[in-house]
Amino acid sequence: LLIATTEDGMELGLYLDASVLERLGRRCPLVALDESNLGDYCTALEGVSHFHYVTWSTGCDRRVSLLELELQAEVDKYASALSLLLAQREGRFPGELFQRLFEGCRLLPHLTAAERERYREAHRCAARFCERLETRYLRRRQARPAALLAELRSFYRLGSHAKLRHALQFV
C-alpha cells in the first residue's frame, strides 16, 4: 500500500505483483481455495485489507497504527479464507485453516527488528482472537455464523488500543 499526503488530503495506491495476480488467474481461489493458491490469495488480500482499512479509518477521521493495520489484515485473511472454504465445502468446517495461517509462519529476512516485532505481535494477537472465534462460533455442535460475522464487524470498528485489548482478552 502506497500512501502520499497531499495538501488536499491523501492519495492511496495498491500495488499487487503481476506474478501473484497471474497465478491467482490460473488457480482462482473463488473457485477452489487450497494449498496451491492460499499464499497468493493471502498476499493479495493483505494489500486489499490495508487499502480498505486506511480508507475506512480516514472516513471516520481516525488515525491507524501500523500494528493495528497488520492485526486487522491477519484477521481479514482468516475471515475471508474461512468464508470461502465454508462455501466451497458446503458448510464443512476447514479445521486446517487456523494451522495453515497461524502456525509455523516465517518472516522475511530483510525486515528490521521493529518490523519483525510488529508483525509478530499482530500475528500473535490475531491468532489468539481467531482461535477463540473458532471455539466460540464454529467448533461447537451448533455453529453460529451470524454471531461470528457480528463479532468480526464489531472488531473491525474498534480503535487501535481497544482492538489489541479485545484480541487478547476475547473470551
Regions found by a protein language model. Give the residues of each.
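Auxiliary, metal-adjacent structural segments of Zn-dependent hydrolase domains
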Residues: 1-25, 34-37, 84-86
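Short helix/strand-bridging catalytic loops that position acidic/His residues to coordinate divalent metals
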Residues: 30-33, 55-68
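Acyl-donor binding region in acyl/amide transferases
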Residues: 37-40, 44, 59, 65, ...
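Active-site recognition of the HExxH zinc-binding catalytic motif
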Residues: 41-55
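Long, hydrophobic, amphipathic alpha-helical segments used as structural scaffolds
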Residues: 56, 81-88, 134-137
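Post-HExxH zinc-binding segment in Zn-dependent metallohydrolases
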Residues: 63-102
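Pan-zinc metallopeptidase signature
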Residues: 109-171
